[in-house]
């Protein structure tokens, strides 16, 4: 019998560098609301909750530079710097707050 567990993932040793070669942009974000706001790894940051105060124009087409499936939580009154990277692939964005619903490049 094998010692492997079904569905088990055994990663190689060492560090995995995320978003290698992508432009990284740092943005200062403040939560002006009275509730925490959580933003996921692949959320179009430009469309994030309106209680988050930041330069939205420079975040168009960008997402958080964090591992897939994770998120950053912004507590009320807190200000923090986050790192963003551009979406890649087809660069089509649908849903979120319905501000784009199409190509990020047109």
From Swiss-Prot:
Metabolic or biological pathway, per its Swiss-Prot or TrEMBL entry: Nitrogen metabolism; urea degradation; CO(2) and NH(3) from urea (urease route): step 1/1
GO biological process entries: urea catabolic process
Keyword line: Cytoplasm, Hydrolase
Origin: domain of life: Bacteria
Molecular function via GO: urease activity
InterPro entries named in the record: Urease_beta-like, Urease_betasu_sf, Urease_subunit
Compartments, record wording: Cytoplasm
Residue ranges that the Swiss-Prot or TrEMBL entry lists as coiled coil: none
Catalytic activity: urea + 2 H2O + H(+) = hydrogencarbonate + 2 NH4(+)
Known EC number: 3.5.1.5
Matches recorded under Gene3D superfamilies: Urease, beta subunit
GO cellular component assignments: urease complex
Similarity annotation: Belongs to the urease beta subunit family.
Quaternary structure annotation from Swiss-Prot or TrEMBL: Heterotrimer of UreA (gamma), UreB (beta) and UreC (alpha) subunits. Three heterotrimers associate to form the active enzyme.
NCBIfam families the UniProt entry points to: PRK13203.1, urease_beta
Entry protein name: Urease subunit beta
Top-level taxonomy: Bacteria, Bacillati, Cyanobacteriota, Cyanophyceae, Synechococcales
